[in-house]
Every structure is written in structure tokens, then in C-alpha cells.
Curated annotation (Swiss-Prot):
HAMAP family: UPF0210. Belongs to the UPF0210 family. It comes from Methanococcus vannielii (strain ATCC 35089 / DSM 1224 / JCM 13029 / OCM 148 / SB). PANTHER family: UPF0210 PROTEIN MJ1665 (PTHR37560:SF1), UPF0210 PROTEIN SPR0218 (PTHR37560). Gene3D superfamilies: 3.20.70.20. This is UPF0210 protein Mevan_0738. It holds the Pfam family DUF711.
Length: 458
């Protein structure tokens, strides 16, 4: 039985504190779509996704209205294209292979537009040990894909705790990100490319979502959001000790996750597909008050990025996980606190006043998900430096047995102190400083960083 206070609290969360379901993502298996003929492959992909997801947007809107809970994004993730395109590329030269990969990406883009979803993810390759010939072609095709599509997201897993770090792939992804930045307006294509260590197979969030090879035929994964709610709770706890803050965040995360599970299961039931997981991640937006940085500042930091920030973030991340895990039997995805610079008004302010830099963000990624996210850097940054930043972040994930990722945006013609404006959820990104000392010789060595001793768990 709900008491009036709880009902009013929920209304307040939604109306004033930006509580919403950030995404309901339909994961679709495409392994049965593989074909030697490119046209048949595209037809199979189109038919399967539209038959399963044709009503996704309409269903999510109906569930949203039923419960009065906003569902901000409706998305689709698919089996990594690198796993299904091999037979199609047999006998083709490199240029033809790249073009064939791009054609599949264009088909995904058409599906996203026809179905009405915000993004479609899964233009992906899993190359944490080595890349197959078709995966190399897929990776090579990413910049061209980004010039020809609007809604397709690409991701590449270059490292795992069990396999180590594929430094050939790290080097290549630095080059791909640089090339993409130069051929898309304001480097917007880079906002749709993620490089992973320990990529989860059931992530509902873009740009890194794909439907993992261990997943079933179709599944709904839900991602919740609620930084504004958590901030409001923490602001009421002035003078209270850290344990009290942790306890109250846990209680709040429980309520948020319960809501996510309710909505996710309802959408899955309506679409007649399995319910997968709830991703517990606190995902900020550029809206005032909907900020991870503001939560940390409410704990007593003058500015996010000052000394104590990593400890405060660790507290937040752990409390959210504990509260969320109690609320749902099936927790997955990234499940932590996101710290994307361009999508968080508090982070942007911290960069502007000099409290937050790239090195501090890297330290913060040791205790939260997911990594160096939506960070704009000078357009003159060489590809080897982009690769080196990726390598550092992959090492953090590999050693700590956690997911880490990099979404860097080298913006042509922009330098430190300037901004790039994307609008909407992607927000505004201040150009952040990177070291000018070279990492080129290290990156050019290639090879594979061996898996750490922590990987020997059997």
C-alpha cells in the first residue's frame, strides 16, 4: 500500500528532479541473417529488426503514458556486425569490402529511421586479442560510415582482463577517430564511436551498445537516470556523516531501479520478447541540476575535480550499485555513474574554472563507469596521442577487472578554451588540454600487452 507521501515524492522526482527512464533498448540477434550475398544480408537484417522492433517506439510511449514516467530514448542494439559479415566479404578486395560494410551500416541507419528509434548500435568489432580480416575491414570503414549515416553507433572492444590489450587495435582506433573527426562536421562522428575494455554484452546505452553473442534472440534492456534525484537527497544531508549519505543514496537508487525494472518488463511483455537487465548507471544530461558533478559538490566539494573528488565519486558509485542490486534480480550493462563532460553542466563548469582536467577525469574512471566520455580535445592532437589516451584507459579497465571506455572528439580548428556545440543530449564540449609530449614511439611498437596476473582466476 502506497502512502500519499510516497506518491508525492515520485511526482516530485519526475517533475522537478528530471527522473526518467533514459532508454529502453531492444537487443536483436543477427547471427541467422548472415549470407554470402550482400543484398540478401541487408534484406535479412532489415526484415528481422523491423519485425521485432517495428512497434518499439509506440509500445514505449504507451507504457510511458500508462505509468506517467518519461522514457526519453528508444534504441536498438544488434549482434556485432564484425561477427556476421565474414562470408559476405569473401573474394572482395579491400575497397569493395569497406564499401560492403558501409552498405550494411546504411541499412541499419534506414531501419533506425523507419522504426523511429534514436540510435542503433552494434556496428562493432570484438578484437581484444586479434582482428579477423572482416573485422579489420569493418574498423577501416567506420569514418566513411559516419559520413553517410545519422543514427548508427560504432564500438570496438580492444582489451579484456583475460586477454590483455591489443595494441595494434589501439593504434588503429586512434587513427580512425582522427580520420572521422576530419570528415564529419565538428567531428560529430566521433561522438558515435566508443573504444572499450571489457565491453558488456547487454549495455542499453549508446554509443557502446551491442547485442552480445551470448544473448538470446531478442531482449529489452532498460537504462535509468536520476542524478537530479540523488542530488536533491544529498543536499538535505548537510552536516551528516558519510555513512548517512551512503545509506540515503542506496535508498534512492532502490526506488529509481524499481521503476526501471517495472517499465522494462512491461515493454518487453508488450513486445513479446525477453526482459534482460536494468542498467543502474546514473546518466546526466545538460539540463540544470541533472548533473553528477553537482552531486559530488553537494557532498561538500567546492568544485568537482578538486581533491576528494575521486573518493566522493567512489562513495556515490558504490551506494548506487548496492541500492540498485537490492531492487532488481537482473542488473547489468555498465551500472555505475557516468562522467561525460559535454553532457553534464556541472562538469563543464568545473573545466571552465580549471578544477577538472583530463588527468583527474582519468583518475575518476578508476572508481566509476564508464571512462573518458564525450571529451573534446584540440584538433591538432596527433593520432598517436589519441591512441595513447585510449591505451591508458584500457589499462585501468584491464587491471581493475572493470569496463572502461573512451569517446574522444578531436575537433578540427579548435584549441583549448574554445567550445564545440552539439545541442540536445550531447550538449556543449569545452576543448580540454592534452599533453604535447609524444607517445608515438610507444604506440608504434604494436603487439599485445599481456593479460595481468589478476586474470589467472581458475
Amino acid at each position: 500500500m502506497y502512502v500519499p507521501e510516497e506518491i508525492i515524492e515520485t511526482v516530485r522526482m519526475i517533475e522537478y528532479q528530471h527522473l526518467d527512464i533514459r532508454t529502453t533498448t531492444l537487443g536483436v540477434n543477427l547471427k541467422d541473417c548472415a549470407d554470402k550475398d550482400l543484398d540478401l544480408l541487408k534484406e535479412n537484417i532489415y526484415d528481422k529488426i523491423t519485425s521485432l522492433g517495428g512497434n518499439l517506439v509506440e509500445t514505449a510511449e504507451k507504457v510511458s503514458q500508462k505509468y506517467g514516467i518519461p522514457i526519453v530514448n528508444k534504441r536498438i542494439s544488434v549482434t556485432p556486425i564484425g561477427l556476421i559479415i565474414g562470408s559476405t566479404l569473401k573474394g572482395l578486395n579491400e575497397e569493395e569490402s569497406v564499401d560492403a560494410c558501409v552498405e550494411v551500416g546504411i541499412t541499419l541507419d534506414k531501419i533506425a529511421k523507419d522504426v523511429g528509434v534514436d540510435f542503433i548500435g552494434g556496428y562493432s568489432a570484438l578484437v581484444h586479442k586479434r582482428a579477423t580480416p572482416e573485422e579489420k575491414m569493418l574498423i577501416r570503414s567506420i569514418p566513411k560510415l559516419m559520413t553517410k549515416t545519422d543514427k548508427v553507433c560504432a564500438s570496438v572492444n580492444v582489451a579484456t582482463t583475460k586477454s590483455g590489450i591489443n595494441m595494434y587495435a589501439v593504434k588503429k582506433m586512434g587513427e580512425i577517430i582522427k580520420e572521422t573527426s576530419e570528415c564529419t562536421k565538428d567531428a560529430i562522428g566521433c561522438a558515435k564511436i566508443v573504444v572499450f575494455c571489457n565491453a558488456p554484452e547487454d549495455n542499453p546505452f549508446m554509443a557502446g551498445a551491442f547485442h552480445g553473442p551470448g544473448e538470446g534472440d531478442a531482449v529489452i534492456n532498460a537504462g535509468v537516470s536520476g542524478p537530479g534525484v540523488v542530488r536533491a537527497v544529498v543536499e538535505k544531508l548537510k552536516g551528516k556523516d558519510i555513512g548517512t549519505i551512503s545509506e540515503e543514496i542506496k535508498k534512492t537508487a532502490f526506488k529509481i531501479t524499481r521503476m526501471g525494472e517495472l517499465v522494462g518488463r512491461e515493454v518487453a511483455n508488450e513486445l513479446n520478447v525477453d526482459f534482460g537487465i536494468v542498467d543502474l548507471s546514473l546518466a546526466p544530461t545538460p539540463a540544470p541540476g541533472d548533473s553528477i558533478a553537482n552531486i559530488l559538490e553537494a557532498m561538500g566539494l567546492e568544485r568537482c575535480g578538486t581533491h576528494g573528488t575521486t573518493a566522493a565519486l567512489a562513495l556515490l558509485n558504490d551506494a548506487v550499485k548496492k541500492g540498485g542490486a537490492m531492487a532488481s534480480s537482473y542488473v547489468g550493462g555498465l551500472s555505475g555513474a557516468f562522467i561525460p563532460v559535454s553532457e553534464d553542466a556541472g562538469m563543464i563548469e568545473a573545466v571552465e574554472v580549471g578544477a577538472l582536467n583530463l588527468s583527474k577525469l582519468e583518475a575518476m574512471t578508476c572508481v566509476c563507469s564508464v571512462g573518458l566520455d564525450m571529451i573534446a580535445i584540440p584538433g591538432k592532437t596527433p593520432a598517436s596521442t589519441v591512441s595513447a589516451i585510449i591505451a591508458d584507459e584500457m589499462a585501468i579497465g584491464m587491471i581493475n577487472k572493470k569496463t572502461t571506455a573512451v569517446r574522444l572528439i578531436p575537433v578540427p580548428g579548435k584549441d583549448v578554451g574554445e567550445y564545440v556545440e552539439y545541442g540536445g543530449l550531447l550538449g556543449t564540449a569545452p576543448i580540454m588540454e592534452v599533453f604535447e609530449f609524444s607517445s608515438e614511439e610507444f604506440i608504434n611498437r604494436g603487439g599485445r600487452i599481456p593479460a595481468p596476473i589478476q586474470s589467472l582466476t581458475n
